[in-house]
């Protein structure tokens, strides 16, 4: 299934002969609706027809609206795409009792995937600095199993992130101006690329959560507060390093001399992340697109909430 992102000003989205038509001043592009899973609007000045919205609703195609950072601020789904009540009841009950256990598993996997990302680049760029970071991350992934509270988990996560990003900064795998990790609102180019990439990843995670009927605002690790999709942030953790960080590192030559992330860079980053998510990886002995792995992982998490499955985070092989 296709996930389409509109990042140009002045685009019109309509319906022609049962297909989505994307129009600008110079040309038209057509996309069959039966191959479309989501459409994200990442630019102001985009218009669309009510006929198209009706077809999206009938077919279960989700329409996301992203802010300038690429973060979804609105989602339009059909009235028939209701939540699965029992799935959410299971989620509420489980998280109330088992938040710590699940958080430990998830952040241990995040650290292992950070380590896999460093190993991936160390294959071709032999570095003592990277090797030291790889060994320290291995140690932290074991230590986190001793965490007694959610604050302990967050402490291990923060320490591992510092080791990971410091090693990338020392060997200049990101921009020359990258010194440490900065969140939303950062003006530093590599951090801006990372932040936009994470926002794109979050729309895939949100889509998978919605398909499973879970509550995106009820997470187990990240703080619960109005407007914050805590479960989306939680489930992103195991994919951040491999899906986004690795892509941003590979694109370094495209942005190393730029001061800010422009429309062209955003388009390149979107395309590369989409290519990564469309790539096939081994999952339970079969080769599946990462998009499908993410969905299966969310269904498996829903199964753990119901007491039917044991959730195992996905670990990437380098």
UniProtKB/Swiss-Prot annotation:
<dbReference type="GO" id="GO:0051607">
    <property type="term" value="P:defense response to virus"/>
</dbReference>
<feature type="binding site">
    <location>
        <position position="237"/>
    </location>
    <ligand>
        <name>Mn(2+)</name>
    </ligand>
</feature>
<dbReference type="InterPro" id="IPR050646">
    <property type="entry name" value="Cas1"/>
</dbReference>
<dbReference type="GO" id="GO:0003677">
    <property type="term" value="F:DNA binding"/>
</dbReference>
<dbReference type="InterPro" id="IPR019855">
    <property type="entry name" value="CRISPR-assoc_Cas1_NMENI"/>
</dbReference>
<dbReference type="InterPro" id="IPR002729">
    <property type="entry name" value="CRISPR-assoc_Cas1"/>
</dbReference>
<comment type="similarity">
    <text>Belongs to the CRISPR-associated endonuclease Cas1 family.</text>
</comment>
<keyword id="KW-0540">Nuclease</keyword>
<dbReference type="GO" id="GO:0046872">
    <property type="term" value="F:metal ion binding"/>
</dbReference>
<dbReference type="GO" id="GO:0004520">
    <property type="term" value="F:DNA endonuclease activity"/>
</dbReference>
<keyword id="KW-0378">Hydrolase</keyword>
<dbReference type="Pfam" id="PF01867">
    <property type="entry name" value="Cas_Cas1"/>
</dbReference>
<dbReference type="InterPro" id="IPR042206">
    <property type="entry name" value="CRISPR-assoc_Cas1_C"/>
</dbReference>
<keyword id="KW-0464">Manganese</keyword>
<comment type="subunit">
    <text>Homodimer, forms a heterotetramer with a Cas2 homodimer.</text>
</comment>
<keyword id="KW-0460">Magnesium</keyword>
<keyword id="KW-0051">Antiviral defense</keyword>
<keyword id="KW-0479">Metal-binding</keyword>
<dbReference type="InterPro" id="IPR042211">
    <property type="entry name" value="CRISPR-assoc_Cas1_N"/>
</dbReference>
<keyword id="KW-0238">DNA-binding</keyword>
<dbReference type="GO" id="GO:0043571">
    <property type="term" value="P:maintenance of CRISPR repeat elements"/>
</dbReference>
<protein>
    <recommendedName>
        <fullName>CRISPR-associated endonuclease Cas1 1</fullName>
        <ecNumber>3.1.-.-</ecNumber>
    </recommendedName>
</protein>
<feature type="binding site">
    <location>
        <position position="157"/>
    </location>
    <ligand>
        <name>Mn(2+)</name>
    </ligand>
</feature>
<keyword id="KW-0255">Endonuclease</keyword>
<feature type="binding site">
    <location>
        <position position="222"/>
    </location>
    <ligand>
        <name>Mn(2+)</name>
    </ligand>
</feature>
<comment type="function">
    <text>CRISPR (clustered regularly interspaced short palindromic repeat), is an adaptive immune system that provides protection against mobile genetic elements (viruses, transposable elements and conjugative plasmids). CRISPR clusters contain spacers, sequences complementary to antecedent mobile elements, and target invading nucleic acids. CRISPR clusters are transcribed and processed into CRISPR RNA (crRNA). Acts as a dsDNA endonuclease. Involved in the integration of spacer DNA into the CRISPR cassette.</text>
</comment>
